Regions:
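Positively charged n-region of N-terminal signal peptides that target proteins for export
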Residues: 1-4
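Bacterial N-terminal signal peptides
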Residues: 7-18
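Non-catalytic beta-strand/loop surface segments
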Residues: 20-58, 63-65, 90-125, 161-215, ...
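Short pre-active-site segment immediately N-terminal to the catalytic Zn-binding motif
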Residues: 64-72
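Active-site SXXK
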Residues: 73-87
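A common structural junction motif
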Residues: 134-142, 236-244, 315, 354-365
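Non-catalytic, conformational "gating/processing" segments within enzyme and secreted inhibitor domains
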Residues: 151, 204-236, 435
Length: 465
């Protein structure tokens, strides 16, 4: 639930007043799910919801950009694109016809740890989409033509979605330099050079290694008959063999930080200078993740948040200021970022950011601040659970990334149980000077003449098709 829930919170409009002031009494609807595992290793999770005649289908593959081969960054994302090409019995782009032509939708996204494909269709098309997902798992056409066409698409996406934005290089640098050992430092979207160096044989090997039933979780939420679903899953998925190849997992551990590091990043077309801090934090499974998420919400959710009030409204030294937790399967980052107002300097912004983080360590947050953050979270999750897609992705993330599908039901109560003392404790533990990397993002014109070329590009946050 971590990333999906937090992205919803970021977009939510805070409901003020006393709408959810009794959060302790607010009961989130529980997801009553069924779970089974086929002999070939495919995990199947399902939730019946007959509130509308629709169904959401998700396939979660436990492979992401951290699994890209060395010097082949971008493979997981590239393969997300190739999965929409032809199969033995489907023409290219047929997934669009099977969904959009009946009033549904489909898409996919790649993150550091997973690649996810999903469809939402009228429930009488469930069997068709199950067949289609089994078809592209078992008999995808990976040939030179499909490989080259999708590589070109991804390279153009790289240019348009990352190189073009004025702050793209900053976000790339945050991951690239904040991680020193773990492959999280590689961009999800890859690099032009690595994609150019790739061959179709490389792609086929990647597919054979990771796209297999024992590395997939099928999630179905909506209007269906459970017995009929089981029969269709057996018919289309149970016949797919489990390969004899070993399933590799990343074993690299990111070392602890022992001293503050500083980075000066330069890029063309920088409209506002930036100052960012990253702090290394543990896996999203760690018990401290709840308090870290609440700390980020208190720092930057809404115009009454601490960072906005201090840096943007009162001191007027920043055009924007934010904090976020990027929690992942192996390790994460707590990131604080501000863009400097015209006429102000990065040094004073850095000083003020540090002061606000120190306040979290020095004293517990107020009851009112904590209540506001809780209200935002409840509001967002209630909205999320209104849709089949929202429920299916929450359940899928709990199963694949948190290791327990029931975390979809227990995570929210855990988050709401965070206390001011918990927030103060994790602030002292993780938001300390020795665990901080500092980044300045400056115009290329300010680079010392002995410097190197512009920094790379960003592709984090989940690449979509």
């Amino acid at each position: 639930m971590r990333r999906i829930l937090l992205s919803l919170i970021a977009a939510a409009v805070f409901i003020g007043g006393s709408a959810f002031m009794g959060h302790a009494q607010t009961k989130m609807p529980q997801m009553v799910f069924r779970e089974r595992t086929l002999k070939n290793g495919l995990r199947v999770l399902s939730v019946v919801d007959k509130s509308s005649p629709t169904v959401a289908i998700n396939v979660w593959y436990h492979v992401g950009s951290k699994d890209d081969p060395d010097h082949r960054s971008g493979f997981a994302h590239l393969f997300e694109h190739i999965m929409f090409k032809s199969t033995k019995d489907m023409k290219a782009e047929m997934m669009d016809r099977l969904t959009e032509d009946v009033g549904g939708e489909n898409n996919a996204f790649t993150q550091d740890d997973v690649t996810v494909y999903y469809e939402v269709v009228p429930s009488n098309y469930l069997e068709t989409l199950l067949w289609a997902e089994a078809e592209r798992l078992s008999s995808l056409t990976v040939d030179e033509a499909n490989f080259k066409s999708e590589r070109a698409v991804v390279q153009e996406e790289y240019r348009q979605s990352v190189l073009a934005p004025p702050n793209g290089r900053l976000f790339y640098a945050l991951d690239q330099k904040s991680f020193v050992a773990h492959p999280y430092k590689r961009p999800t979207i890859g690099s032009i050079e690595d994609l150019d160096a790739a061959t179709v044989d490389d792609v086929i090997k990647f597919h054979n290694t990771y796209y297999r039933p024992d590395n997939a979780t099928l999630v179905i939420v909506g209007d269906f008959d459970p017995k009929q679903l089981d029969a269709w899953v057996d018919k289309y998925f149970a016949v797919i063999p489990k390969p004899n190849l070993a399933l590799p997992r990343v074993q690299v551990k990111e070392p602890e930080r022992t001293a503050e590091k500083r980075f000066m990043e330069y890029a063309p077309n920088v409209p506002l200078k930036g100052v960012a801090f990253t702090y290394l934090v543990p896996s999203e499974k760690n018990e401290d993740s709840d308090a870290l998420e609440m700390a980020a919400a208190i720092l930057s959710r809404g115009r009454s948040s601490r960072l906005y009030q201090s840096l943007v409204y009162q001191q007027q030294i920043a055009a924007s200021a934010s904090a976020r937790t990027d929690l992942r399967e192996d390790a994460g980052l707590f990131t604080v970022l501000a863009f400097v107002s015209n006429g102000k300097n990065p040094e004073e912004v850095e000083k003020s950011l540090k002061a606000e983080l120190q306040k979290l360590q020095d004293a517990p947050v107020s009851a009112a601040e904590l209540e506001k953050a809780r209200n935002q979270i409840i509001t967002s999750e209630l909205r999320n659970r209104e849709t089949d897609l929202g429920k299916s992705q929450t359940l899928g993330e709990a199963a694949v990334l948190l290791g327990d599908p029931n975390r979809a039901n227990t995570d929210l109560p855990r988050l709401l149980a965070v206390t001011p003392a918990d927030i103060q404790r994790v602030a002292k533990k993780y938001l300390k000077d020795t665990n901080r990397d500092v980044f300045y993002y400056l115009p290329e014109s300010e680079r010392p003449k002995t410097g190197t070329g512009p920094v790379g590009i960003n592709a984090k946050g989940g690449q979509g098709r």
